[in-house]
Each structure stands twice: as structure tokens, then as C-alpha cells.
Amino acid sequence: MKTNLTAQVSIDFRAPKARVWKALTDPTDIRQYFFGTNLVTEWIVGGPIRFVGEWEGKSYEDKGTVLKFDPQKMLQYDYWSSLSGKEDKQENYRMITYRMTEKDGITNVQIFQDGETEEAREHSEQSWKMVLEGIRNLVEK
């Protein structure tokens, strides 16, 4: 079974790059579209990142490390999910990368999630599409 596949989604927003970047990095904004999760991080490269919340009645705490933080261009972190059923060790962490571009008032965001099986990739792409639509509802108001 392949586990080196990459989930990839992309969306255009009719919103300024600065507003979309805020939606991707501000804990208050994130809580509104990311299934109610509480983000805990200072966005320092090498620093921790945590997503804490409840999913379908079960508490979770996903954690990882901020790998890249280039404001309004790129954001990257790895993470492990307590809901994954996998042991908390580096080989079970996934890498998430956000890339942003803007042209003529349209901001494009691409999200990549590495290290997926075929089934997990499809699930991840569907989840990220829901997240991006939630961001759209927030930034295009």
C-alpha cells in the first residue's frame, strides 16, 4: 500500500491576500471554519502547534511543529492526530503546506498534505475542501 501520496486542493477567493492569511493563521478565525478547533501556536519556526477540540463527541489534541512561516506566501507544519489511532512517533506525522498567491484581487490558496494512502488522500481532500469553503464564507463576507 502506497503511503507517500499527497492530498492536494486549491481554491480562489475574492478577497485580499492579507485577509485570507489572517483566516489561515488567526485562532479566532480558525475556530469559525475548522470544525471548532482551538489553535495554540505562536507561529515561530521550530515552535509547537496544537489543535485542541472535540470531534463527534470525542476530545482530541493534534500536535506538531511549525516548519515554515513566510507571511502571506507559505505556511508549513507537521502534525500527529490523537484521533488517528496511530502511535505518537515521527513516522506517523503528516506534513501540511499552504501556499498563497494573489492576482487582480483574487487570492489562490493551495493545500498539500503529504504521506497519505489512496483512501486517506481522498478523505483528506474532501476535508480540506470543506475547510476551504468555510474560509470562503468567512473572507468573502
PLM feature spans:
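Short amphipathic
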Residues: 5-13
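Short beta-edge strand/loop motif at the mouth of beta-sheet-based domains
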Residues: 8-9, 28-61, 72
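Short hydrophobic/aromatic-rich beta-strand segments that constitute the beta-sheet cores
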Residues: 49-51, 74-78, 109-111
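A conserved amphipathic terminal alpha-helix motif
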Residues: 115-141
